[in-house]
């Protein structure tokens, strides 16, 4: 407006007030809406995506106002999961059958409240396919890769400083979509294999360096010269191409680490990013030899500096030139409490010279004397890419732990390095080069580089301190024109955590758009300059030495600058500028990615379900996993299952079909008649991660027809019981309805098995040992307790047994025995040539020797010699085939409570139950013999049993094992002709693996004649409980075991009532073993082939289950108060000082001398040792260490504590026993001769007290060393305390300052301690390098053979290595 004019527009006063009032009204309306929204009830919606097997366990949570339209709910769900709206349905999931519910209308304007959503409650919804088609994924999300499917549900990551313990860095500009889709940033992340964050940050930095990426692209891989798997440059090339072209959110680095020669365990080793940088550059230089890129690392990253020393008297200067790839900057000077404030200050300190004076004076070549001198470093040349390492890890000598320095150190965005270059270097005439190591030492300029190997990622990220005041100053444009050493910061590698472990990520500036990005493994997000300032660490202001421990643990660790030189600064190659081989590689990777995408789509539409099949000929249930595309028809799926189960050569395809099956309940749910062309996705209810049912490939014979299984039917396995033959047949399957009555059910069974329904008795086994007679004809099956899968026993004989009470009937006894019978496989001992008298000669004096002859008669044959197992089996087989239950009852004087039931489905009965056999006694004779026997023989030894034996489990013998007759399913057609029916579970009892596992470990209980109170009165002398006499069922038959059981070994297959006691079980086995039960042992064999002896005679076999293996070993069983002891020979001067001799039996109250007397004949016969009783001793054995010497008058359990599986040393003496009293102390001494570099053999020294002076005197006596020259040390580790002769002279604690042996640091309080001693005047032998190496090899070989080398030491850090040949085992000699 021109000054002086008055044409300015001024509103009238009423218009102004009206406008202001309208604004106030609008604001008030908005506030009211907000207030109403806050008061409005909200609806919590929990949506489960059931369309994808990988997301079915994830849930999406939305908390919306109740007035929200339904269409808005669909929009929010679509945005949350990344689907196109309208391509999916939402149905109710609040326990409602979704098949009967119509999906919500995605176009409806109804509010959630009107659509029956409940405010204040959880409303569950299922996201399902729409019209059988899976939802369409948004293009952005489809490029995210497999792992993005999961990330749709994880929500935003915790913000920095929010109190979480995550070490992931998240910027202030963070948003959910910024890490989800590549399109937001244009960059791809790297997947962290385990602890490879340090690798990811370096790889992203190299990728974002134009000069390095362009040079890498120009290198061409020759596949004919090298394996692509082990080529590091090629794998880096592939990785960079994927980072540039992939549509995934993150890609794997496993191919790169595999080219390093790393295995999967290396991914769990956390290393230092600077260490990796050096090692990777070295590896690349080796791989790029004789190529255009041979000098690439040096051209980009290598600088030069001068290491000089100048004499302060004459000015003479000696120097050498070193090269460096990075400059290590100290955070805090040694001994100082203040850290450097900035990188510039640390750089000045780096080149600050030090004065060499006093004892550190420098010998000047010109002055020919020691003079004061100045020593320092000067930069001669800075690299194009300048790398600065901030040494944040230090060692605290107070706590003797490594620490991290979190002090604040600022760094500028632009760094002027011209002030640090040495411009006076070439002008000094008095200089002389000492060495030029530039070509040889291409490393750091300092040798105090710290290489940190983090093995435990237990660092805690305390967050970044929010104080951001910085001393950063940008260099002006005029400065850029004057200087050519202006460096621009473009990468900050950040460490978050502690010295013990942490997390690396990188903040990198893109030269394409000048924006900063955070590359945190697979997450890439845009950040600001303020986020970079937060990585300076600590907080401003002065602090104490330890104050940094309480500041931020997230700070910069490595900085990379690029020289600002327009002539050299490169840009990234565009796609059209790629070399031809890179274009081919891009095309190849795109094809692979498309193939992976197609494969993922196939996986996404593949139904994976368990498949079972009962093999038609082997009758074995097979299991597999059927993977079928949802669009495949049922007919095609049957063909796939048919081939999967390898039935092509067994049965025709048209004799197979798939049915719905519940393996847990062993139940056929339904068949699919007429649905052969229906897609599997529709039959199975869609693609799901898990299904609540399985599929069974059912087979039939060519002359059979398939039954129809309808939903709602229950499956019943019917076992036919024959009371006369005492057999239980294998099951046949019938299907019934729960609303049928018992009468109707009998008629149904009658048609199937052709038994009269009028006299039929049906017993339902609802669970183990729960038998229920269906006696009320009008009751329905549901009222009787039938479920989806049931088991019944049917009997229809015309005997009078049905008139008896069910609990007293023969039927109940037979079923009870059937339920409690288990099958065991018993390995009999090898027939030893040792006579029976020798076997029994090891009994304790005065035990039961008077009954030995009588006991021998029980197991002798007619000719007075022991029968072989084969003879017993053959004789028993012939004589006992026709033995019936009535004969057994007669033998038991008609006592029904003690009757032993028999059946015709076994071949062999225990000869103990045979009445007329001459091979054994009958039951009455057996009982009479047991009653007159020594009751001590059958008392249990509680402490000798393993805890494993306490683990109880229940299992019943399979019906197909116990049955001798088999029935086939038949139905009658209209013409009364029998039509055979195929049944998927015909003539086979399928035991569910899940059900079997569920029953494992459960303790079985059963009622006996008297309640078990745990007292001895409940057991008779034989070890059988008084209520157990009725549980005497035992059948045995020969069994052909697998090859490899050994000559002379025989197997028995035994069917036995598991309620029988171990004592009775052993008595039944006596005729087969050939010795009395007191002279053999029973070992239970577990899955790992471990054997544990069963010794508790009063316990039953309830802890055994079907098909358990038992090993019988000859040897006297333990009596009460006896213990089995393993005897080892102590050979102190042998290479293996511990040698097993034999197993012996020691008894409570026995003296040591008595046990030695019993050992003498056993040692002579079994070990060939002829010993006199006074020329060997017994002593305590603690693992491999010899302990207390047992004196002859010591009594077991009084003076010596003894336990099961006890071990003892037997030591042969050279002379008379010197140990006479427990007050004496026996130690093993060994002389070390340093002048000869060898150890003398052990010599025992017996001390009368624990005095050190007495020990010295004894050592002086046996060695001839003067008393004052004796030095001794206690051995370390287990006996014989082996140590290398190269280490013994300085590693042991020689000549401890103590007066007695039982104090620290010796603590010698028991016999068997090892004492090394030497002559202090004896000089150590001087070894040449050749002698030392030779001796080192010998000692290493010796110690490895003995296995006694003490190898304990704190865990050493594992050096980071890259193996150029891809084989780490070839690089073991490298440091």
From Swiss-Prot:
Disulfide bonds: none
Gene3D superfamilies linked: Cysteine proteinases
Ranges of biased composition (kind: Basic and acidic residues): 912-928, 940-950, 997-1006
Entry-annotated residues carrying Phosphothreonine: 1015
Tissues of expression: Expressed in skeletal muscle, heart and testis.
Complexes and interactors: Interacts with BTRC and FBXW11. Interacts with POLB.
Region described as Disordered: 425-452, 840-859, 880-968, 983-1024
PANTHER family per the UniProt record, alphabetical: UBIQUITIN CARBOXYL-TERMINAL HYDROLASE, UBIQUITIN CARBOXYL-TERMINAL HYDROLASE 47
Biased composition (Acidic residues): 1007-1020
Record: active site: 197, 503
Name this polypeptide is given: Ubiquitin carboxyl-terminal hydrolase 47
SUPFAM superfamilies per UniProt: Cysteine proteinases (SSF54001), Ubiquitin-like (SSF54236)
Keywords: Acetylation, Cytoplasm, DNA damage, DNA repair, Hydrolase, Phosphoprotein, Protease, Thiol protease, Ubl conjugation pathway
Biased composition (Low complexity): 882-899, 953-968
Domain USP residues, every copy: 188-564
